[in-house]
Amino acid sequence: MSKAQFLREYKLVVVGGGGVGKSALTIQFIQSHFVDEYDPTIEDSYRKQCIIDEEVALLDVLDTAGQEEYGAMREQYMRTGEGFLLVYSITSRSSFEEVSTFHQQILRVKDKDYFPVVVVANKCDLEYERQVQPHEGRDLAKRFNAQCIETSAKQRVNVDEAFIAVVRAIRRYQKESGPPQAVNAPAKSQMSAVGGRAAEKDDHVDKGCCRGCVVL
């Protein structure tokens, strides 16, 4: 029986400071368009179905508040998340420094020494405003035993790759710690491939876009 006939659900949480582009990344991934102006997010949830590495994935994506006044909500979604995108803006040193705080909170809530995360350096289209160098993001991700991916929600650079990387990290983690959650698979015609052979390695990140997933 093909791997594509099994549907696994993954609870992804997008975390980061205010104004780093968490909602723009999420909406670009889910709906394939860029939202430039919107009210600060409190909490939005999206669902999207993909095939990643020949396995069906139902992604339940939670876009969270970055503002400090909503900090009390964080532990609640950190308890339920299976993988996290830790987002900062390359144009904001302070947002980069916040990433470690978010990561420490995740490990504390999960009571783990390691948990699946991907560090996402957003707004790479604003190179002329860069405050955080690429090697700094990579070095931080190494501390978390994670991958760092530079993205642009505006230009759709590495947006899909960032979400795919989190799913792959979750799968590796689940193989070590126990079986993943599964739900009934839909008809084959509803599925679209994401992350095929060209993206099999986690460190293969470029401007290619993987589209065509089903939004639920």
From Swiss-Prot:
Residue numbers covered by the propeptide annotation in the UniProt entry: 214-216
Its EC number(s): 3.6.5.2
GO CC, alphabetical: plasma membrane
Alphabetized InterPro entries for the sequence: P-loop_NTPase, Small_GTP-bd, Small_GTPase, Small_GTPase_Ras-type
Cited PROSITE patterns: RAS
Entry's family note: Belongs to the small GTPase superfamily. Ras family.
Activity regulation information from UniProt: Alternates between an inactive form bound to GDP and an active form bound to GTP. Activated by a guanine nucleotide-exchange factor (GEF) and inactivated by a GTPase-activating protein (GAP).
Protein name (database record): Ras-like protein
Glycoprotein as UniProt keyword: no
Cysteine methyl ester PTM sites in chain numbering: 213
Lipidation (S-palmitoyl cysteine): 209-210
Keyword terms: Cell membrane, GTP-binding, Hydrolase, Lipoprotein, Membrane, Methylation, Nucleotide-binding, Palmitate, Prenylation
Major localization listed first in the record, in broad terms: membrane
Pfam entry (one): Ras
SUPFAM superfamilies: P-loop containing nucleoside triphosphate hydrolases
Domain of life (superkingdom): Eukaryota
Lipid modification (S-geranylgeranyl cysteine), residues: 213
Transmembrane segments annotated in the record for this chain: none
Recorded topology in the membrane: Lipid-anchor
Tagged with keyword Hydrolase: yes
Annotated source species: Cryptococcus neoformans var. neoformans serotype D (strain JEC21 / ATCC MYA-565) (Filobasidiella neoformans)
GO molecular function: G protein activity; GDP binding; GTP binding; GTPase activity
Catalyzed reactions per annotation: GTP + H2O = GDP + phosphate + H(+)
Binding site for GTP: 16-23, 63-67, 122-125
Signal peptide extent: none
Subcellular location: Cell membrane
Biological process according to GO: signal transduction
